[in-house]
Amino acid sequence: MKKKLAIIGAGIAGLTLANLLKKNSNHEFMVYEREESLSLEEGYGIQLATNSIKILNQISFDKINNEKIFHPKTIEFYNIQNEKICDLNLSKFNSNEAKYTTLQRSTLIEFLKEDIYTQHLRFGKKMKEVSELKDKVLIKFDDNTNDLVDFVIAADGIFSNTRSFFEKKKNEPRFKKAIAARVILKSKSEFDINEENISLMLGSNSHIVLYPINKKKELNMVC
């Protein structure tokens, strides 16, 4: 039986599910995003393990522009003095169809929105009320629109507004007094590392991660 789904959140999880539904089912669905647009500016890098690549390949991720991604073969571990400790061979987990991949988040979002943007994505939709109505869920948004659906999928992140409408016990993220700073290095770094690999530098209360995000060898650095 055909069902109607509301996906709340147009991030990686929400857009991936939307693409899978469009390709593999006849269910009706809509992605609702509270922001007014998708952020497609050059942003931070992300790493995709082979399990996630297998899922993305079901929606033709293997056809993405190869210049915009990278396949590091090794994770190298260093101490904070840049002395190598050990390494992990990532290529052992690869197959011909699915390889460990690094790229910018915006590159992945650009790919995921391609088949969804026009018909299945609505912006400026912040949920304000949820109620049950004859085995269905009535969603009301703060722009005075609504939708009646069979299922609601919360994909709006760790600060999820959606989750608060369904959880009996309220849970909130806890600040662990740790922060992450991210930057893209577009020129050769001053670190003594192999810039085709993932480098993890370990300190007593901190660490630095560097890895290439495209064939131009631009590096994502997190510290």
Regions found by a protein language model. Give the residues of each.
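Beta1/beta-strand and adjacent pyrophosphate-binding region of the FAD-binding site
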Residues: 1-13
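Conserved N-terminal helical subregion
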Residues: 2-5, 22, 49-184
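Nucleotide donor/acceptor-binding cores
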Residues: 3, 27, 137, 195-196
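Residues at the starts of beta-strands that form the adenosine-phosphate
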Residues: 4, 27-30, 218-221
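Conserved Rossmann-like nucleotide-cofactor binding loop
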Residues: 13, 37, 159
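Glycine-rich FAD pyrophosphate-binding loop
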Residues: 20-42
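Short helix-loop capping/hinge motifs at secondary-structure junctions, enriched
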Residues: 54, 187-194, 216
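Active-site substrate-recognition segment that forms the wall
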Residues: 196-223
